């Protein structure tokens, strides 16, 4: 689960991180009062969407030379003018795709005198099975580009969970970020604070980009991105309350109600599979034969008829889907249950696109019999390769 920047900063402020004063607003009429609560004379007006690249983004409704989704204002009047121009419009960034995201919230923040911009994040390093800091002196940039072009400028430092952030870890992080004086002293406090927030709140990512050194030599969290482990949300009611479903795909929200692992993609072949590995293999083979998957959908090992029906409805709700591939290997999951669910869903929502079904495993003969006797126009497949070829051919024809 993702949250907005202003929510992430409020959370980190609660742990003692150095965060600038700021006020979130939902209407342009709130802009003046919000700005008056801040010291000034510089203000930053920030679009709040769940996507990066806001500063370089463009609003669909504005002229191409209009400013992006993060704007500097030198007066309260400028804050108000920017708020009126940004709220309600659609911001397109490198992460939103061409459809963009509507800006329904702004964060008015006190400006900062920046001396240096740094990069810092904490994530789970799966190669060692530990939380790890990733830091670089190249802040405010796309860290993936830095990793590709100048990997020597990035330090990845795994943290032993039983010890937490040690003095030695702090020394290494300060050295990698070239911090000294007051900034290094701030680092001694900040690094353990961020690690504590990451672990206590079950985050999957905590990214500060940039972490800045101000002209007075002190550190400040200038931007913050936080993602949480969905599997741990039951422990954090306070975090769940921060969820903004307007930023999420409606189909993914519906899938979560049925405990379905669903991720919307940009292709035109819908997939319903059991098991994450088989689901990824199914998407790969669709791409191998020249098409693109419209989604990742894992119905799991113990899906009921109702769950399968819900999954099928979610797939068919995507207007981009031109064909559907059901690929089931029945271990715990029974093929007859899948067959009954698919038939129930087709009868309820109708079938306007080609449907290829490949079943194998537990009760496979019964599953195939149920489908063959259903009277539905379903294309059977013998194996995964055969299924992929048939659905791609059906969609292209």
From Swiss-Prot:
One Gene Ontology term, aspect cellular component: cytosol
Enzyme Commission code(s) on record: 6.2.1.5
Binding locations of ATP: 46, 53-55, 109, 112, 117
Residues that coordinate or bind substrate: 274, 331-333
Swiss-Prot/TrEMBL catalytic activity: succinate + ATP + CoA = succinyl-CoA + ADP + phosphate; GTP + succinate + CoA = succinyl-CoA + GDP + phosphate
Keyword Magnesium (UniProt): yes
Cofactor: Mg(2+)
Enzyme class: ligase
Keyword Acyltransferase found: no
Alphabetical keyword list: ATP-binding, Ligase, Magnesium, Metal-binding, Nucleotide-binding, Tricarboxylic acid cycle
Cofactor mode of binding and number, as noted: Binds 1 Mg(2+) ion per subunit.
InterPro entries, per the entry: ATP-grasp, ATP-grasp_succ-CoA_synth-type, ATP_grasp_subdomain_1, Succ-CoA_synthase_bsu_CS, SUCC_ACL_C, Succ_CoA_ligase-like_bsu, Succinyl-CoA_synth-like
Record domain ATP-grasp: where: 9-254
Example GO molecular function: ATP binding
Pathway(s) this gene product operates in, as recorded in its UniProt entry: Carbohydrate metabolism; tricarboxylic acid cycle; succinate from succinyl-CoA (ligase route): step 1/1
GO biological process entries: succinyl-CoA metabolic process; tricarboxylic acid cycle
Residues that hold Mg(2+) according to the record: 209, 223
Function summary: Succinyl-CoA synthetase functions in the citric acid cycle (TCA), coupling the hydrolysis of succinyl-CoA to the synthesis of either ATP or GTP and thus represents the only step of substrate-level phosphorylation in the TCA. The beta subunit provides nucleotide specificity of the enzyme and binds the substrate succinate, while the binding sites for coenzyme A and phosphate are found in the alpha subunit.
Family label: Belongs to the succinate/malate CoA ligase beta subunit family.
Matching NCBIfam families: PRK00696.1, sucCoAbeta
Subunit relationships: Heterotetramer of two alpha and two beta subunits.
Record-given protein name: Succinate--CoA ligase [ADP-forming] subunit beta
């Amino acid at each position: 689960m993702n949250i907005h920047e202003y929510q992430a900063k409020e959370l980190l402020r609660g742990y003692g991180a150095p965060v600038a004063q700021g006020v979130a607003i939902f209407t342009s009429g709130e802009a003046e009062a919000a700005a008056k609560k801040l010291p000034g004379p510089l203000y930053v007006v920030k679009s709040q969407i769940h996507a990066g690249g806001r500063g370089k983004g463009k609003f669909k409704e504005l002229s191409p030379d209009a400013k992006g989704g993060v704007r500097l204002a030198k007066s309260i009047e400028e804050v108000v003018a920017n708020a009126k121009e940004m709220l309600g419009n659609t911001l397109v960034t490198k992460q939103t795709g061409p459809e963009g995201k509507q800006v329904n919230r702004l964060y008015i923040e006190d400006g900062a005198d920046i001396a240096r911009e740094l990069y810092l994040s904490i994530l789970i390093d799966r190669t060692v099975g530990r939380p790890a800091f990733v830091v670089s002196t190249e802040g405010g940039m796309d860290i993936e580009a830095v990793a590709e072009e100048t990997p020597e400028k990035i330090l990845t430092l795994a943290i032993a969970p039983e010890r937490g952030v040690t003095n030695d870890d702090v020394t290494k992080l300060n050295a990698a970020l070239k911090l000294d004086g007051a900034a290094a002293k701030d680092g001694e406090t900040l690094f353990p604070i961020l690690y504590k927030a990451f672990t206590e709140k079950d985050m999957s990512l905590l990214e500060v980009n940039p972490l800045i050194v101000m002209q007075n030599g002190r550190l400040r969290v200038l931007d913050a991105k936080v993602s949480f482990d969905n599997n741990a949300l039951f422990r954090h009611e306070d975090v769940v309350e921060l969820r903004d479903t307007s930023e999420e795909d409606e189909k993914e929200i519906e899938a979560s109600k049925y405990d379905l692992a669903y991720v919307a993609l940009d292709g035109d072949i819908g997939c319903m599979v059991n098991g994450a590995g088989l689901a990824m293999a199914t998407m790969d083979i669709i791409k191998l034969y020249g098409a693109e998957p419209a989604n990742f959908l894992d119905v799991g090992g113990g899906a009921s008829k109702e769950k399968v029906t819900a999954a099928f409805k979610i797939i068919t709700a995507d207007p981009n889907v031109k064909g559907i591939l059901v690929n089931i290997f029945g271990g715990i999951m029974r093929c007859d249950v899948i067959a009954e669910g698919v038939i129930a869903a087709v009868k309820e929502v109708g079938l306007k696109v080609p449907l290829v079904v490949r079943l194998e495993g537990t009760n496979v003969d019964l599953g195939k019999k149920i489908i063959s006797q259903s009277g539905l126009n379903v294309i059977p497949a013998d194996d995964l390769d055969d299924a992929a070829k048939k659905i791609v051919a059906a969609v292209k024809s």
